[in-house]
Amino acid sequence: MARFLFTCWSFPGHVFQPMAIAHVLRERGHQCAFYSGPRAARTVEGENFPFFPSDKAEEDAMYDFMFAPEQTRTVNWRTMLQFSSTIQRWLLGSIPQQVRDLERIAAGWHPDVVVTEQNMWAPMLVLHEKQHIPVAVLGYISCFVPGPDAPLFGLGLPAPRNWYTRLLTRSVWLGTAPFRAGYRRSANEIRRRYNLPPLRTSVLEFTGTMPLYLVMGTSEFDYERKDLPRSVKYVGACLWDKLRHERPSDWLEELPKDQPWVHASEGTVHVVSPFVLSAAARGLANLPMQVILTTGGNREPSELDLGPIAPNVHVVRWVSHTELLPRLAVMITTGGSATVQTTLRAGVPLIVIPTDWDKPDIARRVVETGAGVSLTPAQCTPQRLRAAVEHVLSTPSFRQNAQRMAAAFARYGGPPAAADLLERLAAGRIPA
């Protein structure tokens, strides 16, 4: 049996999806362990997996600059330089500590394969060559390896399907070349410390040279790309069902069944004002629908100033998506990958208000599949959100396209398919 070391950041969504794969591997007799920030310890150890924590001071510093309210978390032409600096500090500045940690773990635990999320670069840039350990990459919902079939990730740009969008993609690619060159220079400086040769491609292109790149999503949601290396495999949604750890949402049974149900969530981690929940509470008040608002794991409903709460609006900290989604008419979300995949897998249309990081790109994909609409945070007023909800409810094509995406997700194997490929990698049968 093989040993698989999963390395990921300690954000909840980054832990939960690898966890689904680890459970399948363990059921097949393999050993799995996790390397992440101390904030992930409770989740990982609660599932009885060995846990190797990264440095707490480094994690605290990363959370401070990643989630500070004034931090730049979205990219446009005005914020490009600051956003690039933030990403460089996060992805490249953390590599030396990761290497020290992972070398120590490798010496004691002896993993056969390191399975790393696409945003943790030390295993790909250093460990794979220095320790001669096979590395598999985990992509959340889409593939970051650049190519002509997809826009540059981070800007929420449309897919290059016609002359205009192809020209736009090419122009952005050329305009951002200095930033990519800066990343590569910094990566090569790090590689030089470990006596590794310099990269000849961008860092993201280099990630596609790993022996296996698993995308926890579908090709249909990722523009059906034909430009990816053979190592890239779409395995479908890898979602960890935590229902057995939580109390059932019995109160849902008391809600009227003859009205559409609308759910609004700002995700597990939300550091700005609850503007989506506030717009939903005000804009959907007293309409012929049931509105379920969840505040997330780090906020109590009583802490939020959402204004007067109408009888048809229900504010809770958490609700089981397993129980809620089969009854849902519309999902309102800030665009986290797990929420979007869970919703599409259930065939429910979305309204996405993308807030930061990869969410504008996820929102763009939702719109291009026809499974929902997108509003910018500035557009998320009570009036516009109400109009968006009424538009989605009254337009059958949104649900039809969401159901089409659900059928696409059903064609993929999910965690068992990912486990199959990882077993092949551990056995030396990848690349074929």
Mark where each language-model region is.
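A donor-sugar binding/catalytic signature common to diverse glycosyltransferases
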Residues: 22, 116, 317-364
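Conserved nucleotide-sugar phosphate-binding/catalytic loop shared by glycosyltransferases and other
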Residues: 33-83, 163-168
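Donor-nucleotide binding loops and adjacent catalytic segments primarily
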Residues: 217-330
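Conserved nucleotide-sugar donor-interacting segment of glycosyltransferase catalytic cores
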Residues: 91-166, 220-221
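Active-site-proximal region of nucleotide-activated glycan assembly enzymes
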Residues: 135-223, 229-231
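Conserved nucleotide-sugar donor-binding subdomain of glycosyltransferases
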Residues: 68-123, 166, 170-204, 208-209
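C-terminal amphipathic helix plus adjacent low-complexity
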Residues: 109, 382-432
